[in-house]
């Protein structure tokens, strides 16, 4: 609660209170996440849209999703409460790759790549990664200031890659990194996931491993006129800056 949910909720409450106090803010773009949309019991092969909410997230089963959906609810309730509110849009990125600006950025979405390039994991696990480039996320935020619907909800997702695909791409483009080649069998990954990452519990593994989920980002393409860097390009273009930052 204190580490994940409270910072998101209290921080968002502070932001909207500051907007009201200032009285001069005309446009507000709230950075949310696909985690605010993805329910716990999604179906393999399902495509999700912004019509869905992660309202089944709890502190026990999905604290990050709870943090994101709670913060967005605060924003939307505030926005609908009375006249004179600024224009408001929410942006929902998936896993964000692309060149990092500082070492702290390697602790988030790029930890997936960092684990590969530093060979923190000897074998690969059978998992799909939904990807968007950080530069596209930034562009979507700028466009949402003046484009799209007031109160709009926009997914920013360029595509997806299997973890094994990502590792293969890195081996092809940066052979000196010697990223892992072999995948661990599903059943072993299912029961021994914490050996690869302490965050991989049995329930999480059962929900995500060897399953695919897709996202409909066409509203952002249509209403924000977005086009996307390919997932592969985002992977490849992430690495040089990671090397420059001294993490590889």
Where are the language model's segments positioned?
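Active-site Tyr-X1-5-Lys
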Residues: 21, 58-89
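Conserved sequence/active-site signature of Rossmann-fold short-chain dehydrogenase/reductase
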Residues: 36-37, 96-98, 137
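Conserved cofactor-binding/catalytic machinery of classical short-chain dehydrogenase/reductase
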Residues: 11-14, 70-71, 133-136
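Conserved Rossmann-fold NAD(P)-dependent oxidoreductase catalytic core, especially the SDR/UDP-sugar
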Residues: 2-62, 89
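Mid/C-terminal beta-alpha module of Rossmann-like enzyme folds, strongest
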Residues: 140-201, 222, 231-248
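A conserved pocket-lining segment of Rossmann-fold NAD(P)-dependent short-chain dehydrogenase/reductase
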Residues: 1, 55-61, 102-103, 110-132, ...
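Glycine/proline-rich active-site loop of Rossmann-fold NAD(P)-dependent oxidoreductases
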Residues: 82-86, 98-111, 144-154
């Amino acid at each position: 609660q204190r580490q994940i949910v409270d910072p998101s909720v209290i921080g968002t409450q502070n932001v909207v209170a500051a907007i009201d106090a200032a009285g001069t803010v005309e446009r507000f773009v709230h950075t949310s996440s696909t985690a605010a949309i993805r329910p716990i019991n999604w179906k393999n092969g399902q495509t999700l849209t912004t019509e869905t909410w992660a309202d089944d997230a709890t502190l026990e089963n999905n604290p990050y999703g709870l943090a994101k959906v709670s913060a967005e609810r605060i924003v939307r309730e505030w926005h609908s409460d009375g006249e004179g509110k600024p224009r408001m849009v929410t942006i929902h990125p998936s896993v964000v790759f692309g060149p990092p600006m500082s070492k702290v950025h390697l602790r988030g979405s790029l930890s997936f790549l960092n684990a590969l390039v530093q060979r923190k994991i000897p074998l690969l696990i059978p998992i799909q990664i939904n990807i968007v480039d950080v530069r596209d996320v930034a562009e979507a935020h700028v466009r949402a200031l003046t484009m799209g619907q007031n109160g709009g909800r926009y997914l920013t997702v360029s595509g997806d890659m299997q973890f094994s695909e990502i590792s293969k791409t890195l081996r092809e483009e940066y052979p000196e990194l010697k990223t892992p080649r072999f995948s661990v069998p599903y059943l072993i990954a299912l029961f021994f996931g914490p050996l690869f990452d302490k965050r991989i519990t049995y329930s999480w593994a059962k929900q995500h491993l060897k399953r695919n989920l897709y996202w409909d980002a066409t509203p952002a393409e249509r209403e924000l006129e977005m086009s996307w860097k390919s997932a592969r390009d985002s992977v490849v273009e992430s690495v040089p800056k990671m090397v420059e930052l001294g993490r590889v």
